[in-house]
From Swiss-Prot:
It is found in: Secreted. One of its GO terms (biological process) is cell-matrix adhesion. This is Ependymin-related protein 2. InterPro entries: Ependymin.
Length: 201
């Protein structure tokens, strides 16, 4: 009887671990280190992100590798379906339409259909950061197919690194690696998400 209980608990534990569907705090700030590679180009950048889940919007600003940190910012507002590309120094702004769903952007959350692929620890002993990894696939209306692997902290589902392999309709491949650091729950400066008057006009 004891053995049956142990086996049942082990099965339940495995089922819980293998289930996706978790999200980090609904509002946060973080730096994103981005690497994009395809057959013709390689791009790297370090951006600052402000994520406002309840209002379905987020901001990416600057690129410290090109000395643009703080001078340019893009605000993606999915409730309005508009993105604002803002140059703070030049006081200029352009807009472009947004498509798709907010929750599918930046792969911040682990979706329900994600498959658990293993766990790991960064560091050692009591100072180790324990993490879980998942894998899932997405097909987009434009024909792109994506295989996504993501690693998040065991506690609070905070993203650590996401790797996306994309194949377009013509068969071309690209690799997108997104790493997070200096993660801070909540929004330190909500004014960064305000649309300036010269952009609304």
């Amino acid at each position: 009887m004891i053995l049956q209980v142990v086996l049942l608990l082990a099965c339940l534990s495995g089922a819980i671990v293998s289930t996706g569907a978790c999200c980090p705090p609904s509002r946060f700030n973080a730096f994103q280190y981005v690497t994009i590679v395809n057959s013709t180009t390689r791009t790297r950048g370090l951006y600052y992100m402000v994520y406002d889940g309840p209002n379905e919007r987020y901001l990416l600003t600057g690129d410290r590798l090109k000395n643009l940190y703080g001078t340019t910012r893009v605000i993606y507002d999915y409730k309005k379906g508009i993105a604002y590309n803002i140059d703070v120094q030049k006081r200029s702004c352009t807009t472009f339409p947004l498509h798709g769903k907010f929750e599918d952007q930046e792969n911040v959350c682990v979706p329900r259909d994600a498959v658990y692929t293993g766990r790991s620890a960064y560091g050692f002993d009591q100072g180790a950061l324990h993490s879980w990894s998942y894998e899932y696939n997405r097909t987009h209306p434009d024909g792109r197919h994506q295989n996504i692997e993501t690693t998040v902290t065991k506690e609070n589902c905070i993203p650590i690194v996401t790797t996306t392999i994309s194949t377009d309709a013509s068969g071309g491949n690209s690799l997108h690696i997104l790493g997070y650091n200096d993660f801070y729950p909540g929004i330190r400066d909500i004014s960064m998400l305000e649309i300036p008057s010269y952009c609304r006009a």
